Amino acid sequence: CQPYSNPHAMNIHIRPYSPEHCQAVLNLSLRAWQPVFAQMQPAVPSFVYTNFYPNGWEARQLSDLQAVLDGEPEHVWLACAGSEIAGWTAIRLHPEDRMGEIYILATAPEYQRQGVATLLMEHAFEQIRTAGMDMVMVETGGDPGHFAARQCYESAGFQPWPVARYFKPL
């Protein structure tokens, strides 16, 4: 999450999502998150991981992401390098809390650490601000797989709210 550390980031433009990009966005997400899930799985109790991902993390992510792309396309933006999608984001608005949320942020592996996530977040901040919200939230995991995401959000000025989740098998 480094601002413009690579000349490629200067050639990135943000554009609205449209359905013809669906498969490319889904493929990018799986490539971006494969190493995250590989590091996350051993850090999560096995019964929790199995319940969340009974058919594998890829199937769950594809289903969840497809629902966002189909149901909230007006809140999805792409970072494009020419005709190639370098990353994407989706936001949600929570007017009851005067808060926007960066619900999804994914960068293609070949564009990571080149400022793409920063550009997407800045665009999301502007969309959320324009909607009249006073703050923005992002959630991520506390496991080793999400370490880079935590660094990215902290470097963008996000402050953590300590939360604990506990699980018990029945």
Residue spans for each PLM region:
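Intrinsic-disorder-associated, low-complexity terminal segments enriched in Asp/Asn/His/Tyr and depleted
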Residues: Y4-N6
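Extreme N-terminal starter segment of soluble prokaryotic enzymes
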Residues: N11-H13
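Acetyl-CoA-dependent GNAT
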Residues: P16-Y103, A108, M121-E122, Q127, ...
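Active-site acidic-Proline motif in GNAT/NAT acetyltransferases
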Residues: L93, A108-Q114, G145
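Conserved beta-strand-loop-alpha-helix junction that forms the acyl-donor binding cleft
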Residues: Q112, M137-A149, F167-L170
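Short acidic/polar active-site loop segments enriched in Thr and Asp
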Residues: D134, Q159
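Conserved active-site tyrosine of GNAT-family acetyltransferases
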Residues: Y153, F158
